[in-house]
Amino acid sequence: MEGWQRAFVIHARPYSETSLLLDFFTENEGRVRILSKGARGRRSPLKGALQPFTPLLIRWSGRGEIKTLRDAEPISLALPLTGTVLYSGLYLNELLSRVLENGTSYSTLFFEYLSCLQILAASETTPEAALRRFELALLTQLGYGLDFLHCAGSGEPVSDTMTYRYREEKGFIASLVVDHYSFTGLELKSLAKREFPTAGTLKAAKRFTRMALKPYLGGKPLKSRELFRQFAIKKCAKKSVLIEDK
């Protein structure tokens, strides 16, 4: 690969004493695993650039599964993700690192990812709707072609007030059962449009994407969720101390 590509670091781990093994999400090649030799060294010019949420231009070489980084240049400063939105960004990166196939193009998803990061960077609290839209875009890119607008049993258009139960690999079937797997027709229409005007439709979207992504993620828990839980616990504890001091 001789040309430059836009990319983001989505995962990194030490490799030997001075190098890094990186997963990049690239504009044209999707997820690519690349070895950056000497990137951990004190004098490496790449040390500050190879960070999450920094838009990059990169070049690499190699024919095997693990490529070798040749050049990397920041396009701009890192997108400023702090506080709770930082953990949302880490969640996006972990999703991509775990579910995308190596070397498969997801060019549309690359721009969905960039857009979501920009929304996160402009927010003080996590914009849940942006995360749900990204998850739905990811499912579409993975080939998850689910019809939200028709009953999988009858083929008829969904009705706003009726209840439909989700069945994996089949779709939504009209049902009188109301449980974790049930959605109203109105909620399904919101999922189809990727628009969530109410708290109820937003909660339904989160419930659905959790279920739909589970087969891709397997049984291994997401580290980003655990990190966010620890952050939230510490934040609550700090608030309690401040209240007691007043």
Swiss-Prot record:
SUPFAM superfamilies, alphabetized: ArfGap/RecO-like zinc finger, Nucleic acid-binding proteins
Taxonomic superkingdom: Bacteria
GO cellular component, one term: bacterial nucleoid
Key words of the record: DNA damage, DNA recombination, DNA repair
Example of a GO biological process term: DNA recombination
Pfam families: RecO_C, RecO_N
Function: Involved in DNA repair and RecF pathway recombination.
PANTHER family given in the database record: DNA REPAIR PROTEIN RECO
HAMAP family linked: RecO
Similarity remark: Belongs to the RecO family.
Cross-referenced NCBIfam families: reco (TIGR00613)
Protein name per Swiss-Prot or TrEMBL: DNA repair protein RecO
